[in-house]
Amino acid sequence: MQLLRQAPGYTDATIQLLAARSLAAIADTITFERHAFQPYLQDAVVALAHLLQSGLEEPDSVRSITHALCVIMDRVDTDMVPYGPALADMVPKMWARDDPQMRLKPSLLEFVSKLVEKYLPHIEAQAQMQALVARLLRDSFEPAARPLLGHDALLLWYHTLASSYALSAPLVELLSCAPELLAQPEYAPLMCRVWEETVLLAPEDVLHAFGMSVYGAMAPMVGHPNSPVIMEPIFAIDMHVRALSTASLGAMANIMRATPLDEAIFASLC
């Protein structure tokens, strides 16, 4: 911990990075004791957060710090909740850093994904965190960024929904990206999981707003005889049907008939 703190003349960024990597390695061992680490938790989080915001340029350096924070979040679990707001507040400035080659942003997406997984379920005011996530996702799904950030962004989207008890407008609006993501085999399975979590939170609302476009995009996945992802949309459809009220099942059936989805499902059984 002494090496992790900023102390001019005693430590520098190189020493602090080595200390951060050592701390992550210690926290990741089976002998790590959560309660024994409790007296050092605040100092560790403050030091790592300060180092992360200190203008590190190398992606490996940023990754070392975010990895250390992720490991600590995993190991101390709910003890990390009080530090959630401060960690979330530093994300926008870091995300806005000049990063034309997208070398820093993957580490930030992984970090925020772990943050929402550990922090979001324990707060009532989830909308602000969801809005931050939506901003990161929208940027990540831009055509120039998607090949490098798309997979990590979808994981962040999934973890955010799985950790939420309600949908805010920014996350709902993101569903406009779903048909295009479903059309790409590398993203389709994760997008189906995202849809599953979404329909659990707001089954009727998303059915009426996005059902036609999303299920229209899923139909080719189900109907293609050699589709490698046929089960993912089937699971998503099943989840939605189970989540809907009886009164809304007719609307679901109409959408399945209006798209080729019902025919595709029957054809896949033959």
What are these model-derived regions, one by one?
Residues 1-270:
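Karyopherin-beta/Importin-beta family HEAT-repeat alpha-solenoid scaffold
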